[in-house]
């Protein structure tokens, strides 16, 4: 009652910060001093996780005697899982199992601030960081006093990644000047084919930006369809793993004597899935293509809608299978797209946004009272609506990212995070697992499950086996005396693998759950593994359906124990209850293990996939309309956030964070199979390992020496150049100079609910083709009485 009375008395005169300070205890509690610092981590990125483990190991090695050691507390469920876990521990006042630090978004600071559990980093030197990237601390509600509560150690932004070969086919078809390009025109019940009569125009004469973009688009198509020095198409080297239909197509293409530069071959390949171009009103007839289309939301959505109208394979399918063209534009984060477009439409001013932080409180009145943000949302939604109605947009509804489809030419372009570069493109040998009309890209960190055989016991209880790396085994047997072991044994390599057994009813006494055995409980998985093994006995195993005759002949000579009946992975794939299921993981594993059954492995030609050098990477649209005065770029990524524990642990926590930001150490940096040692801070090591940007002042200086050095290293080393990180760095430099307005969500304990609500309701509107009134009504309903 004391707090309630106090809040009422002061609310008319003071901001929330003053109220909280004046009212004393607000649920704050001390954690038990257990002599260690716990860092909560919920990111799903393996590279980020591995980097953080290396950092913790390093700190515990170099810390002074008496300093607290640090350990990682793993939380499942990504950022949302971390948010939920922290809220629960705050609510129950967890004094024994709470943590001191968490990597997450700054709305968690507001959640902590409501009960006085936020930790001010007043003993951490943040002088190395650019001030503009610390400004978000001024937009956090419920904190008791101004200061640094969140430190951005892993920044990313969003880019517009164009599938060059696909856009080339679209534009070249609409231009009508490629070889044998014809257009479908529907007249009554018949479809007639004719030359393009109202061609699209590309002004390369008077528009340097458009000229440059078109040249890049042409180059990407040439790369996609070009021939190797020996005259083979670039997918030919992998043909022995391609499907029989691909073999036929490849033979036809190589039998033809062509002298084109590769772009025509690329167009022909894209046409197989995208279909014929159609001249329609409101499409690309007489349309002028400009590079500036991709700079603002209004023009981008208008152009995308025109493309969707021009291809039946896009507009004509309300329900799309996984193997269909998914749309023209892919959007990985619909909240990001809606927030940045509305923010840009409001002149890059938080006073015109959905909500703002003022006097320590979040003010949602602009949206609630149907002010500028509500009106701008209505305009933005209206631009999206045309694309939605023509089935031209793909949205991520929970783990199915645009890149999963764009890399297989199923989207023309997409907007996604710069942290996802290494997931965004196909490799030289692109593989995927097909389940009927759907598929997933062949996951990383995946093992094949082999059918049981007499060699591994032949028990009816045994479903199959797979192998994992055994770190306890030596990779090479040491050389021994010739007289004792013979020359033939010297330097002989020993397998560094161990076999894991999958059982269906019980694990035998000579095996141990989580060490060399896993018990499968899901009956659907058991049935599909057993069916696959039975098919193998008849020579009908599904995993070889797409193999060439050469591969099948080789497989026929193999023992049945080599037959693949499924797959298991620790990669971040989502279980669907049909083909992908969660199973128990091994004791040595940090990530959930999944099992994949009923799948057909398919290896694709490179011309059927998007390589990194065939993509054109642009900033995500920075304006709502071309005439807007300010350009906006989103800044996002997890921050280091401190949590109050007790006086000693608070001091030790700040000591670690200060070391993390400022102390230079030696780090092993892997580059493919090679590795080298690099001198840098833990923060720099973490950001580089996870494809993030650390906002250091020195990389934003006018002379930009460090940025140039980083870019040179990126393009000259053996790894593929990270064009997403390069674009992010360029945008962040412009933010630092004040040339671009940075957007990040104002941080309030209700921010997550607002973000999730607008995203889920927009995604539902994409599926149902709802109008604005229905969309916004559903959105407001999800917010409840809290907002």
Curated annotation (Swiss-Prot):
Annotated compartments: Cell membrane
Major subcellular location class: membrane
Biased composition (Low complexity): 242-261
Keyword Membrane tagged: yes
Compositional bias per record (Basic and acidic residues), positions renumbered to this chain: 209-219
Protein name per the record: Uncharacterized lipoprotein MPN_288
Keywords: Cell membrane, Lipoprotein, Membrane, Palmitate, Signal
Pfam families referenced in this protein's UniProt entry, alphabetically: Lipoprotein_10 (PF03202), Lipoprotein_X (PF03305)
N-palmitoyl cysteine: lipidated positions: 23
GO terms under cellular component: plasma membrane
Residues making up the signal peptide according to the UniProt record: 1-22
Topology class, membrane: Lipid-anchor
Lipid-acceptor residues (S-diacylglycerol cysteine): 23
Domain of life: Bacteria
Family under the similarity heading: Belongs to the MG185/MG260 family.
Disulfide cross-links: none
Region (Disordered): 178-270, 473-495
UniProt feature, compositional bias: Polar residues: 181-208
